[in-house]
């Protein structure tokens, strides 16, 4: 497909999405929920064919030398498919927010003014590796009354095509236009350039992937962008804290799964608890094969314990390590003077995604919540909870690190906007 044909192709997708968006925006909640339930059933019924398509992607990606963490993201297990099927059913069970009027107040003139929640219209989703995003994005589009154009990574093209075909089938079975969810069927990068430059059809772009992708989209897009940046998440172990709880959380936040963007990449430890805490967590990390990139103070403490030093992979940290999203069994470790230095470090080096404090001090917890400039800030909980399902959103289309429109996990409400509605009884302005 040459550049001219790609431009025509994307214009066609845009027009079809815009037309479909008007129909799905006014669809009753029962119809949208029926489509979601249909999709959940189809995912379960087609498990074998979906995994066969995914296997073709995995084999091609492995032969091309795709890195281990990205291969992990590409894989569609039976558990992954059941999770997205359950997500569709959970969305179907959630209240429909479209048409909801909030903040209705009577003004001195007698008019009543409020805001109605309405669909955005058409969103374009650009994402890498994870084929389950196809279902997450499609299901949220359906529930929120939007249309969407999906452009997944070339490494997942077979998986995405198989999943998108089921979405279209579910929509048609429910009496909704199949074009409400469309997958860009070419892996040519020119399609991305076209998608982000169609303001006449696309109302917002949501890129989800590496920093290079996000920066390119943000720079070149001619429509608004909701950014899902990388996840350089931190856990800060405060003085005072419950050491046993801190060890449990720091272990889970890093090792429960390495590839998600909400996995912890940086561990900050208050000097007052470092001698008690660091040897315990280092023993766990060492047993699980986690490389520890330590500042001088942390390394000094760990080297003083021969039993740990003999099994642990302790490496001097560089300045770049404080910025790094590893997506791998690697963690940076730094000893800090206290909560203020921890906050300053996080605000300087983090990606403003998710950061947690583990503490017994209420004032420290409140200061951390107020001053850490991240989309999700936690007290005494694992960063792995930064997820739409865990936050009760039913599903998420990404975790926005922006400060406008949507911040944190973007669920149904993040895919809507508010318009003012005015109710009068014949009032005129004097």
Swiss-Prot record:
PROSITE patterns: PROA. GO terms for cellular component: cytoplasm. Pathway: Amino-acid biosynthesis; L-proline biosynthesis; L-glutamate 5-semialdehyde from L-glutamate: step 2/2. GO terms for molecular function: glutamate-5-semialdehyde dehydrogenase activity; NADP binding. GO terms for biological process: L-proline biosynthetic process. It is an enzyme of class 1 (oxidoreductase). The gene is proA. This is Gamma-glutamyl phosphate reductase. It is found in: Cytoplasm. It catalyses: L-glutamate 5-semialdehyde + phosphate + NADP(+) = L-glutamyl 5-phosphate + NADPH + H(+). Keywords: Amino-acid biosynthesis, Cytoplasm, NADP, Oxidoreductase, Proline biosynthesis. Pfam families: Aldedh (PF00171). Its EC number is 1.2.1.41. Belongs to the gamma-glutamyl phosphate reductase family. Catalyzes the NADPH-dependent reduction of L-glutamate 5-phosphate into L-glutamate 5-semialdehyde and phosphate. The product spontaneously undergoes cyclization to form 1-pyrroline-5-carboxylate.
């Amino acid at each position: 497909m040459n550049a001219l044909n790609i431009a025509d192709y994307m214009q066609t997708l845009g027009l079809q999405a815009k037309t479909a968006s008007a129909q799905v925006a006014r669809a009753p909640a029962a119809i949208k929920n029926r489509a979601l339930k249909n999709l959940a059933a189809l995912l379960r019924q087609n498990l074998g064919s979906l995994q066969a398509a995914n296997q073709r992607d995995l084999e091609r990606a492995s032969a091309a030398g795709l890195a281990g963490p990205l291969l992990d993201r590409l894989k569609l297990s039976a558990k992954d498919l059941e999770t997205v099927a359950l997500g569709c059913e959970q969305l179907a069970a959630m209240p429909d927010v479209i048409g909801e009027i909030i903040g209705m107040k009577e003004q001195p003139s007698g008019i009543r003014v409020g805001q109605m929640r309405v669909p955005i219209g058409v969103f374009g989703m650009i994402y890498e590796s994870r084929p389950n995003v196809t279902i997450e994005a499609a299901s949220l589009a359906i529930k929120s009354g939007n249309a969407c154009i999906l452009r997944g990574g070339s490494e997942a093209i077979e998986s995405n095509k198989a999943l998108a075909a089921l979405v279209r089938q579910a929509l048609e079975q429910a009496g909704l236009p199949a074009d409400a969810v469309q997958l860009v069927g070419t892996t040519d990068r020119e399609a991305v350039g076209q998608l982000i430059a169609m303001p006449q059809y696309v109302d917002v772009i949501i890129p989800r992937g590496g920093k290079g992708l996000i920066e390119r989209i943000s720079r070149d897009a001619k429509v608004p962008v909701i950014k899902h940046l990388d996840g350089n998440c931190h856990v800060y172990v405060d003085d005072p804290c419950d050491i046993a709880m801190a060890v449990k959380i720091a272990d889970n936040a890093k090792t429960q799964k390495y590839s998600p963007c909400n996995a912890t990449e940086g561990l900050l430890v208050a000097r007052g608890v470092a001698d008690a805490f660091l040897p315990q967590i280092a023993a766990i990390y060492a047993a699980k094969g986690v490389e520890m990139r330590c500042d001088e103070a942390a390394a000094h403490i760990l080297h003083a314990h021969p039993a740990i030093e003999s099994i642990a992979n302790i490496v001097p940290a560089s300045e770049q390590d404080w910025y790094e999203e590893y997506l791998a069994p690697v963690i940076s470790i730094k000893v800090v003077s206290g909560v203020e230095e921890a906050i300053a470090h996080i605000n300087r080096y983090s990606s403003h995604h998710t950061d947690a404090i583990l503490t017994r001090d209420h004032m420290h917890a409140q200061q951390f919540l107020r001053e850490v400039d991240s989309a999700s800030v936690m007290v005494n909980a694992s960063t792995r909870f930064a997820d739409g399902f865990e936050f009760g959103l039913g599903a998420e289309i990404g975790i926005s690190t922006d400060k406008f429109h949507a911040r944190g996990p973007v669920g149904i409400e993040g895919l809507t906007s508010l318009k003012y509605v005015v109710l009068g009884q014949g009032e005129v302005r004097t």
